[in-house]
């Protein structure tokens, strides 16, 4: 058995168009012999969507995927009644359009692409993944210097997967890009939302505020889910706690 799991997420789809999860073990045999320093541990992908480096199209992705998505932490949740789920927390792009470039001073509904990259890749897309009209492929005036992937709106979300789907991936009966969340929870109403106004140019504001959630942890014995809200106490995070019911 592989008792540990790890993963990563990078905006732009470099690590896959959705969260990634790999199962592994830190020992090399049935006796529990630790791996030697520098050993490459074998890992089994449980969740791995298509990479943007392999496909320019939004395919084999998380449903509703956008390039500005941010998935920062994940946990295996088990309730007192024995129900289980794999939960990821992050800041999800949910806007009608998303683009590579800058925040547009005219408003979140207006893209502001980096003109230098127009023609190199699809710098602006609609929510369904199709390209934006040509009228959106212009760099606005008066923007700041914080270039990256932006959506016209973000939401702080938990997404929950059925562990049975991930087990099917490990068994080879599902492809690693096939599992999808069975539930999505928007938790923005519980957040402080950068009350000190730290790094507005970097973080965005209002509907375009990203970097909302950070790492997560789960207290299995007491059913407590701990989630970091980033930039909630000036530059420091605040820990939110949810009681998971059975």
Where are the model-predicted features located?
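Sequence/structural signature of beta-propeller domains
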Residues: 1-246
């Amino acid at each position: 058995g592989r008792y540990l799991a790890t993963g990563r997420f990078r905006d732009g789809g470099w690590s896959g168009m959705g969260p990634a999860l790999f199962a592994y073990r830190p020992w090399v045999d049935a006796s529990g012999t630790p791996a030697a320093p520098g050993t490459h541990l074998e890992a089994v992908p449980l969740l791995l969507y298509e990479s943007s480096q392999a496909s320019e199209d939004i395919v084999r992705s998380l449903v509703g995927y956008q390039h500005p998505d941010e998935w920062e932490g994940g946990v295996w949740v088990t309730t007192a009644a024995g129900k289980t789920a794999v939960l990821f927390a992050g800041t999800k792009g949910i806007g009608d359009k998303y683009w590579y470039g800058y925040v547009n001073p005219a408003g979140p509904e207006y893209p502001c692409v980096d003109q230098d990259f127009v023609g190199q890749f699809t710098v602006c897309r609609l929510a369904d993944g199709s390209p934006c009209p040509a009228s959106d492929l212009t760099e606005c005036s008066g923007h700041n210097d914080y270039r990256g992937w932006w959506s016209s709106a973000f939401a702080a979300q938990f997404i929950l997967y059925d562990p049975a789907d991930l087990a099917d991936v490990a068994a080879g009966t599902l492809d690693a890009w096939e599992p999808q969340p069975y539930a999505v929870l928007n938790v923005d109403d519980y957040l402080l939302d950068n009350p000190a106004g730290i790094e507005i140019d970097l973080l965005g504001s209002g509907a375009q505020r990203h970097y909302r959630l950070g790492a997560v942890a789960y207290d299995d014995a007491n059913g407590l889910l701990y989630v970091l809200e980033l930039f909630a106490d000036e530059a420091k995070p605040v820990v939110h706690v949810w009681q998971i019911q059975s």
